Amino acid sequence: MTQNKFNLRPWMMLLLRSLLFFVFQGLIGLAVFSGGFSSLWEGAAAWWPITVILTDLICLGLLVSFYREEGERFWDIFRFDRQHLKQDLWTMLAFLVLLGPVGFLPNILSARWLFGDPQAAADLLIRPLPAWAAVLGLAFPFLQGLVEIPMYMLYVRPRLEKQGVQPWLAVALTGFFLSAQHVFIPFIPDPRFITYRLVMFQPFALLIAVVMRWRPRLMPYFGIVHVLMNLSVAVMFLLVMHI
């Protein structure tokens, strides 16, 4: 891969989502809640699906624009490669087999280690919202499928490598920040919760980073799986919403 001159943009994109989550949580707190800072921030934490939607819309616009600047089309990354369709389906089947132990066990085990009961961590994440907000939250899984993995793995990672970053380090960085952004969705200033959100997706994020570097044409399949995973979370908000 030809090494290009230093470009700050991919480095900023590593941090952008975390920053936007934090800012939008604060703005929602100011708009919806009154009282002291602690109650404002705590109340806004329940609205994290909306912060994700707002963040994803900004990131989607940036990605479309950045790809266009480079003479490419962002939406092309979601095209299925029909020439390798059967091979890619078998690869995704193998990935789904790993999804259980790598994707879900760290979540459950870290919650049990830090909180004693995984349900305690879940209760901090899934809180009642007004019905309209819970319904609007159904948009976040689809936006996540369009933005999250493409941003880190197909935009940032290749451009870090073009600047001379070693492939293993580019994979490690994008995998780490893909996981670490969850500290801010929502951000709750509790060391246990911060640790939980930092580590719960780390093995899964690194697996995604490795697979996406090896076979980036799997992006449309990853997008579908990602939407379905997040859709199950969005449905939980419907089950606890204020009617």
For the regions a protein language model found, what residue spans apply to each?
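Hydrophobic alpha-helical transmembrane segments of polytopic
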Residues: 52-55, 96, 174
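Transmembrane helix-loop-helix hairpins at the membrane interface
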Residues: 26-29, 130-243
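Residue-level signature of transmembrane alpha-helical entry/exit and packing/kink sites
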Residues: 10-18, 44-52, 87-92, 129, ...
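N-terminal, membrane-interfacial amphipathic/helix-forming hydrophobic leader that caps
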Residues: 1-80, 87, 113, 231-243
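Residue-level recognition of hydrophobic positions within alpha-helical transmembrane segments
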Residues: 6, 13, 21, 52, ...
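Juxtamembrane helix-loop-helix connectors linking adjacent transmembrane helices
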Residues: 36-49, 72-147, 243
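Hydrophobic membrane-targeting alpha-helices
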Residues: 23, 27-31, 35, 65-66, ...
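Hydrophobic alpha-helical transmembrane segments of multipass integral membrane proteins
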Residues: 57, 101-102, 176, 231
